Amino acid sequence: MVLTIEPFGHAEYENIKLLEKRFDIKLPVDYKEFLVTQNGGRNSSYTFENSIKIDQIDEVINIDTMFGINTGIKNADIEQWTEEYRNDIFEHSIIIGDTIQHGFLLFWQSGDDNEGIYYYDDTYQLEASSDENNAYFLAKTFSEFMDLIQN
């Protein structure tokens, strides 16, 4: 794991279960462990690159914040962002973070070959983004996603 952020603290297993129930998803063990140990975090003052290359369009994004559960920090909660964009994102997905490029990191639990972590360019900052396509596959699992991050 090369992600470098200032953690928000620790999520409680009970709150993780409530999140899963609210958005009708089943989070994988590796992501639950991340929430319990760090509960997300911020790249304060953009000290670290935290970059990921989107291979299909040859663009790079930089992680700003990984959201958590009940962080008590403005604009840092999974529930807040997922609820706000619920009608715009895939069913059975949650928004788990954002980037310096103003897009979101989306964890989609589709139950098929398409599930995984995506970059959702809701503001069309990337040249390749359009109304037809503004979500880009990054990784199948949270562990694979973490392995993509460069600093």
Question: What spans do the regions from the language model cover?
Answer:
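A surface-exposed partner-binding patch
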Residues: M1-Q101, Q150
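Short, surface-exposed beta-strand/loop micro-motifs that present aromatic residues
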Residues: I95, G103-S110
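Aromatic side chains
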Residues: F23, Y31-F34, Y118-Y120, F142-F145
